[in-house]
Amino acid sequence: MRKEASNPGSNYQDGQWNLVHLKFLTDFMEETGLTTASVAELVGISRQAVYYWFKKDNVRISMIYKLFEAYGYKIEFDLIKERPTEGEPARVEMEVERESKTGKKLEFLASALKRYNIYREEISPKMGIGTTTIYYWLSHDDVFISYIYKLAELAGLKVTIRITPNND
């Protein structure tokens, strides 16, 4: 049996979808009282399109950025190592300011590829995509979020998401 979300009129039922990639979004919606209708209005699409995101557990990352910006929040993604590999010395990574220098949404992806020596030619076949696909994502500054999670899993990385209110 599914329980209704605490926000009446949200049209989102907890447990309706088995979310992995968009769980952070439904958690945020529940915390802030956003409904699927208000999300649709903020990004300029239909409610059905938002339902489709949750049905497929996938959305273009540009839509995520657009939603959070429109709602007055900043969202930052990063890919980090969960734990050192065997034989690698343990090191404490200091929290660094990850402010985008280029303003690109996928700067975190380009940075992680470089930081962890992940080569497109090696990871692309494992992901079932062409070797130029990752280059395409970076040059067009957009990707479906499921690919970020898939790349992270194959590379032994963890997707981290930081959401903060804009202080303009």
Name the predicted role of every residue range.
Residues 1-32, 87-117, 162:
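A short, Lys/Arg-rich alpha-helix, primarily the initiator
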Residues 24, 35, 60-63, 119, ...:
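Residues that mark the N-terminal boundary/hinge immediately upstream of a DNA-recognition element
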Residues 26, 37, 110, 121, ...:
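Residues within the helices of the helix-turn-helix
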Residues 29, 40, 68, 124, ...:
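The alpha-helix within a helix-turn-helix
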Residues 33-51, 117-135:
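Short alpha-helical DNA-recognition segment
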Residues 54-55, 71, 138-139:
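DNA major-groove recognition helix of helix-turn-helix
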Residues 62-78, 145-161:
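DNA major-groove recognition helix of helix-turn-helix/homeodomain DNA-binding modules
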Residues 78-88, 164-168:
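Short amphipathic recognition helices of helix-turn-helix/homeodomain-type DNA-binding modules
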